[in-house]
Each structure stands twice: as structure tokens, then as C-alpha cells.
Amino acid sequence: MVKRYGELYLEARRALRASEGENASFVARELLGFASGKSAAALMADRELYASEQTAERMEQYTARALQGEPLAYILGKWSFYGLELTVTPDVLIPRDDTMAVTELAIGKLREMEAPQRVLDLCTGSGCIGLAIAHQIETARVTLADLSQPALRIARKNIADLKMIGRVNALQADVREPAPKFWGQFDLIVSNPPYVTAQEMTELDVSVRAHEPEMALDGGEDGLDFYRAILQNFTPALRTGGWICFEFGFR
């Protein structure tokens, strides 16, 4: 049955209300935009027009995925962070607004340093922190590092998509191992490491537990395993007067 854009939106919003609450309108609008290839403004203008069968089928599929708990960012394959549109997949954590705090802290510290500022983003995932830094501070030279090769593929795609090749690079590194090749190279290290405790891992919302990468969440028994490892193994990577900036959880 052929339906209008407005009908597709309202049906999805109703279906999503129980799981998404007040966010149902936003999710339904984003899904319809993705299914149709139209902007929010175009959908509003075209709400009385009939959508194609292909658009209606895609909308049904995307809504079903959302109802099963799949995060919106993974359905869309992209997410916005610090004004940048980033590719995201289940290989990386979804960038969250909370992470803007450590990003802003790092940017503030780097503005006080002489150019070119050398930055290492550990446990980088999608690269969101390091890429935001590079976007805000053009003189910064940023290295994105992660143990996960699938995550590094996403980070490298984001580097290329944002046209930051030459200022940002990505490489594999295990923060649990000493890294003498990095010693004395960086003015600032920034990291949003895994910090969920063993107990909290069992209590995570299904949308996180079933879809986001466990290795990017699990911080060990007390949630501090990666902080200890980074401080032990990567403090020597700092130049004199350098900084380490961490995101951490509250409990």
C-alpha cells in the first residue's frame, strides 16, 4: 500500500513511542530521512506527497531494527560529534555528548602550547576526539591509536572523508604494552578508554550491551585497568610539560 511521507513518519513515531519516549519523533524523522534521502525540511514540505514503495519498505526495515534495540547511529551508519559527521559501525562506540568535555579540555590545553602541537588519541575508536581536535586546531598533528583493526578502518575512513590526511594518521597500539617508539613525541595524550566495571557490564542497557563493542567498554573489575596501563606505559611518550586528558565515569 502506497503511503504519504507524513503517514510513514506518524506510524514510525507511534511504534517507537514505547521504547524511545519523547525521542520517538526525532528517531522517526531521522529514519525517514535516511529511507527517503530527503532532508527534514524536504520531508516537511513533501509530507502530503506519496512515498515510493522502496522508501516505505526501507522505512519498515529501519523501524523494525530500531524496535529491536539497535542504536540509531548504527542504522544510519553515521553520527555527529563536535560539528563533524562521522562514519560509525558496530566496530566502534557511538560518540556521545559526554565526550565533548574531555575534547574541550584537550583543545583548551593545546591552545596554550606552541605549534605544531603533537597529539596522541588512545583507544580512539571512530577517531572522534582526535578529529575534533584537528578540526579546531589546524596546527595540531594528531595520531589516532587503537588495538582494534576494524576500528582503525573506520578511523581512517573518517580521516579521509574529513580531508585530514597529512595532519592526522591512524595506527595500531595496545595501551597495555610499553610503547618506546612513542617516547618523548607528544605534547598531549587524550583518551576515552574502556571504563565500565565488571558489575556495570552486567547492567548495561540492551542497546549498548547487544550492539556496541565490548572491548571498548570493559574496563576490568574496577573499571580502571586501562587508566593504569596508559599512565604506566604512555607517560614516557609525553614531552616535558605535556598533559594526559582522560574521560572517566561517575559512580
Give the predicted meaning of each segment.
Residues 100-203:
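Conserved SAM/SAH cofactor-binding pocket of Class I
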Residues 106, 133, 208, 230-234:
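Class I S-adenosylmethionine-dependent transferase superfamily signal
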Residues 195-226:
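Mobile active-site "lid"/loop adjacent to the S-adenosyl-L-methionine
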Residues 1-43, 48-51:
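Non-catalytic accessory regions of SAM-dependent methyltransferases
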Residues 32-109:
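Conserved AdoMet
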Residues 221-251:
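Conserved Class I SAM-dependent methyltransferase catalytic core
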